Amino acid sequence: MSKRDFYEVLGVSRDASERDIKKAYKRLAMKFHPDRNQGDESAADKFKEVKEAYEVLTDSQKKAAYDQYGHAAFEQGGGGFGGGFGGGGADFGDIFGDVFGDIFGGGRRGGGGHRAQRGADLRYNMELTLEEAVRGVTKEIEVPTLVHCDSCDGSGAKKGSSAETCGTCHGHGQVQMRQGFFAVQQTCPTCHGKGKIIKDPCNECHGQGRKQKTKTLNVKIPAGVDTGDRIRLSGEGEAGEMGAPSGDLYVQVHVKEHHIFERDGNNLYCEVPVSFAMAALGGEVEVPTLDGRVSLKVPSETQTGRMFRMRGKGVKGVRGGGIGDLIVKLVVETPVNLSSRQKELLKEFEESCGGEAATKHKPKSEGFFNGVKKFFDDLTS
């Protein structure tokens, strides 16, 4: 089957810049990466095709040869792979490491020698109460992870023995294969990129150098965190291969809903009910805060929904910026379960507000009905 044009594979024009080529490669490599398409042979083939196109079009010599001769440029002098194995040559692993190293927890292997793979990063979802998030707290957590085997010190080899340098790649973890007059590096098929062969594996970890364990950690949560904040614990992720550095543990914070307060940034919000008599006549009402109850003076003739700001009663931000405020919304309650006498008093009150002077006791009603009147006047004019 004939190969597709490399420019077509990456979806770029022939005069595309190296930056455009790299951008297209990253997008397609992410899309077709085997770790994201496990078991999908079609995606694996497309990933190889994209990688091959990128390797050619970002190398000035290869690109010039391809632009002049097409795929035939890489089939000269033997037509395909040949020339045996070697340890040197150009390294095309750099861009692969740049794109996928952070996503899949991997390091990258350079042409100058093998570097063991860093351990994978882990994530732990932690749920906090609002009080814990605002004040800070230390939480004990248990994390299942991979740790270095203490029996072999992470080497994978039985105590008293050691791993041997791979004879195929001479410890590089990669081998060089020749395609036409170009050399391409690939993962060593003997040691699978590790650079070493373990002939006498450790009985504890079966040659892996790592074993499963549940770690207990005390995590200090700083005051002021909020949902979406992430705390990094360096080196508390999975242990790396063959003694390589461990990954990191990221604690993802989620703050549970509170039955009184809502949080927006460093400010807190709450609703406080008041009787219609207090709203009309004024008075004082107790308001809950995270530090205890405080009194709020309610002015006379307060309408429902009015907001009051209590400065410094909010949250101290984890990134600084001072302490937020508590915003109190007063909600005027309509009385229920009235006795006959209470109903009579309310009727008397309503009648006393009637007549031409009624609107002066109901400022919102006056504005509303004036607006309704104007609306219908406009319709009929």
Curated annotation (Swiss-Prot):
The gene is dnaJ. The keyword Metal-binding applies. Binds 2 Zn(2+) ions per monomer. GO terms for cellular component: cytoplasm. The J domain is necessary and sufficient to stimulate DnaK ATPase activity. Zinc center 1 plays an important role in the autonomous, DnaK-independent chaperone activity of DnaJ. Zinc center 2 is essential for interaction with DnaK and for DnaJ activity. CXXCXGXG motif repeats lie at residues 149-156, 166-173, 188-195, 202-209. InterPro entries: DnaJ, DnaJ_C, DnaJ_domain, DnaJ_domain_CS, HSP40/DnaJ_pept-bd, HSP_DnaJ_Cys-rich_dom, HSP_DnaJ_Cys-rich_dom_sf, J_dom_sf. It comes from the Bacteria. Residues 5-70 form the J domain. It holds the Pfam family DnaJ_C. This is Chaperone protein DnaJ. It is found in: Cytoplasm. Keywords: Chaperone, Cytoplasm, DNA replication, Metal-binding, Repeat, Stress response, Zinc, Zinc-finger. One of its GO terms (molecular function) is ATP binding. Zn(2+) 1 binds at C149, C152, C202, C205. Participates actively in the response to hyperosmotic and heat shock by preventing the aggregation of stress-denatured proteins and by disaggregating proteins, also in an autonomous, DnaK-independent fashion. Unfolded proteins bind initially to DnaJ; upon interaction with the DnaJ-bound protein, DnaK hydrolyzes its bound ATP, resulting in the formation of a stable complex. GrpE releases ADP from DnaK; ATP binding to DnaK triggers the release of the substrate protein, thus completing the reaction cycle. The lineage of its organism: Bacteria, Pseudomonadati, Pseudomonadota, Gammaproteobacteria, Vibrionales. The keyword Cytoplasm applies. Disulfide bonds: none annotated. Zn(2+) 2 binds at C166, C169, C188, C191. Gene3D superfamilies: DnaJ domain, Heat shock protein DnaJ, cysteine-rich domain, Urease metallochaperone UreE, N-terminal domain. SMART domains: DnaJ. HAMAP family: DnaJ. GO terms for biological process: chaperone cofactor-dependent protein refolding; DNA replication; protein refolding; response to heat. Homodimer. Belongs to the DnaJ family. A zinc finger (CR-type) spans 136-214. Its cofactor is Zn(2+).
